[in-house]
Amino acid sequence: MAGVWKVLVVLVGLAVVACAIPHRRLRYEEVVAQALQFYNEGQQGQPLFRLLEATPPPSLNSKSRIPLNFRIKETVCIFTLDRQPGNCAFREGGEERICRGAFVRRRRVRALTLRCDRDQRRQPEFPRVTRPAGPTA
């Protein structure tokens, strides 16, 4: 019976210590890297995207919710399970996207919301062709 009590005390002690240890804060760069990896996994058969710049929030007070804001650009590599975008060159004239979202961590649950839209300011402009409205001779 004494052995059972010792095991129970050890288990309770371990549970208290596990609850008392704070979650390690993820660095903003780590969260952005995870978000980009998640985004690229949805690009099967499409070009991978690589990080151009990340804009961390002015202050990161929350351990549980991290707002995301970063830009990515298309690379010359196509998605495969083992390909890392960091090893791929940017595609000349490649599409750029602005990504916004949030990373939320509550106890053992992690959630990522992410939306990456084309950066309209960075798209190449094509010359406009004007034609006369009337019939041509």
From Swiss-Prot:
One of its GO terms (molecular function) is cysteine-type endopeptidase inhibitor activity. The keyword Secreted applies. It is found in: Secreted. Belongs to the cathelicidin family. Binds to bacterial lipopolysaccharides (LPS), potentiates weakly the early antibacterial effects of BPI. Inhibits the late lethal action of BPI. Residues 1-20 form the signal peptide. GO terms for cellular component: extracellular space. Pfam families: Cathelicidins. The keyword Translocase does not apply. Disulfide bonds join C77-C88, C99-C116. GO terms for biological process: defense response to bacterium. Its main location: secreted. Large granules of neutrophils. It comes from the Eukaryota. This is 15 kDa protein B. Keywords: Antibiotic, Antimicrobial, Disulfide bond, Secreted, Signal.
